[in-house]
A protein has these predicted regions:
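N-terminal glycine-rich flavin-associated loop
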Residues: 18-51, 68, 73-118, 132-165, ...
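C-terminal substrate-binding/cap subdomain adjacent to the FAD-binding core in PCMH-type
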Residues: 129, 148-306
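A short linear hydrophobic-aromatic micro-motif
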Residues: 49, 113, 231-236, 343-350, ...
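N-terminal flexible segment immediately upstream of the FAD-binding catalytic core
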Residues: 1-41, 48, 55-88, 287-313, ...
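Conserved glycine-rich FAD pyrophosphate-binding loop
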Residues: 55, 62-69, 75, 119, ...
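A generic structural motif
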Residues: 26, 249-259, 355-362
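Short, surface-exposed ligand-recognition loops at beta-strand->loop->(often short) alpha-helix junctions
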Residues: 1, 209-216, 262-263, 321-331, ...
Length: 435
């Protein structure tokens, strides 16, 4: 059998490499960059397909190919390589858990300005490879805004360095952008250098509820806020379905997060109170309450490493990401609620009025879920946006096209893949168009 054969090859080829087998699958746990390089080189020469893992929280993104020959897990390739406190930069191994990194940096009053899903389990390599970001993307930006250098192990075993370890290091093409968000289809990120920010002095969360359901009020308020001098780090709209679960409020709600020195936060709170529509209900949440709220938000998306979610396949839970022009998020959230009210499905949705990114969770029967995916994707197209499926139960794999129409630049992506991974061994089917 291939599993037995590959297991024997790995133990002979790299006798000190940790190797495990389960469910007819070989998993290796490299602890050094050279081991990652040797494993990839061997797999490339022998055309063995590889799935790259960190904490496993994003293992469900894209459509993982279940016939990969080997899983390369970076959970034991961890640690801080270099932290320059004065320059506010840190270089870290890709398998380091995101929350572990933040706890270390907090000792120096610094942090990485990102808010990925499942921060307790996600690894920094997975966050960067998936370009993961959350509702605070409005103020924080994305991984592309935080990364200043990457070391990547190519499929043929070569180790390439792009960017550097200081903030001002750009000369020529910014190769970092090529790997951020590539879902491990071009190589394995081994080390990442990030620029840091100081830990915020004060944090506040304002919840605006709209019992009347008048989303034009929401839109008008958002325009006023975005046109003002205020700098919220999030402006996230939640439909009644998810508001009921997170806030015990079965109405449209708007979550505004503020982070700055305390005087600035209090000043912005006062301005928002003055701009607040008369029909809206305003609640200012304590700092600890704000942290607990966002923690719940970050764990609403499916966790690819959660066995309970895998076992609950019968629920047909599907996650979608929809991207539109920022204020069109109001229309997407409204449409999601209409679909939930009018069909035998439950649709929970939230989106950033400053970013245009919506996250949608759909539950129901197989037929209703498929129909809802199609409706939302088509609706996004009418807004010149897109809709992709982030998580899909195996029973729907043959029914739903997770990527939708290939973008006009798809030939460029395919050409890059062919050049960097000609044997197509890296994370098959994990990127646009099944790359």
């Amino acid at each position: 059998m291939v599993t037995t054969e590959l297991l024997g090859e790995m133990k002979t080829f790299l006798p000190n490499l940790k190797v495990e087998t389960s469910d007819q699958q070989v998993t290796v746990y490299p602890q050094t960059e050279s081991e990652i390089s040797e494993v990839l080189k061997y797999c490339n020469e022998n055309k063995r397909k590889v799935q790259v893992l960190g904490g496993g929280t994003k293992s469900s993104l894209g459509f993982p190919n279940e016939t990969v020959d080997l899983k390369l897990c970076l959970s034991e390739y961890t640690g801080i390589v270099e932290h320059t406190v004065g320059d506010m930069t840190v270089t870290v191994k890709a398998g380091t858990r995101y929350e572990e990194l933040q706890e270390y940096l907090a000792q120096h009053n610094q942090r990485v300005a990102l808010d990925p899903s499942w921060p307790e389990h996600a690894t920094i390599g997975g966050v960067i490879a998936a370009n993961d970001s959350g509702p605070k993307r409005l103020g924080y930006g994305t991984a592309r805004d935080s990364v200043i250098g990457i070391r990547t192990v190519y499929p043929d075993g070569r180790i390439i360095r792009s960017g550097g370890r200081v903030v001002k290091n750009v000369a020529g093409y910014d190769m970092n952008k090529l790997f951020i968000g590539s879902m491990g289809t071009l190589g394995v990120l081994s080390e990442i250098t990030l620029k840091l920010r100081p830990v915020q002095k004060s944090e506040s969360l304002l919840i605006l509820s709209f019992p009347s359901g008048n989303l034009e009020e929401v839109r008008s308020f958002a325009i006023k806020l975005l046109d003002s001098m205020m700098e919220p780090v999030s402006l996230e709209l939640f439909n009644p379905g998810i508001s009921a679960r997170l806030l015990d409020k079965n109405v449209y709600t708007l979550a505004i997060s503020l982070e700055d020195v305390e005087s600035s936060v209090r000043y912005q709170e006062e301005l928002i109170q003055k701009l607040c529509p008369t029909e809206a209900e305003l609640e200012i949440v304590s700092e600890e309450g704000a942290k607990q709220f966002w923690k719940k938000v970050y764990t609403t998306l499916p966790n690819g490493n959660d066995s309970k979610q895998k076992d609950a396949d019968s629920e047909k839970a599907v996650s979608m990401k929809i991207g539109v022009v920022n204020l069109d998020v109001v229309k997407v959230i409204r449409e999601s609620q209409l679909l939930s009210d009018g069909q035998a499905v439950t649709v929970e949705a939230h989106g950033g009025l400053g970013t245009g990114i919506c996250q949608v969770m759909i539950r129901g029967s197989k037929e209703d879920v498929v129909q809802t995916i199609t409706r939302l994707r088509e609706y996004a197209k009418t807004l010149n946006g897109y809709g992709i499926v982030r998580y899909l139960p195996g029973s729907l794999a043959e029914t739903v096209d997770i990527w939708g129409d290939k973008p006009s630049y798809y030939p460029l992506l395919e050409g890059i893949k062919a050049k960097m991974d000609p044997n197509r061994i890296m994370n098959p089917n994990r990127f646009v168009g099944g790359i």
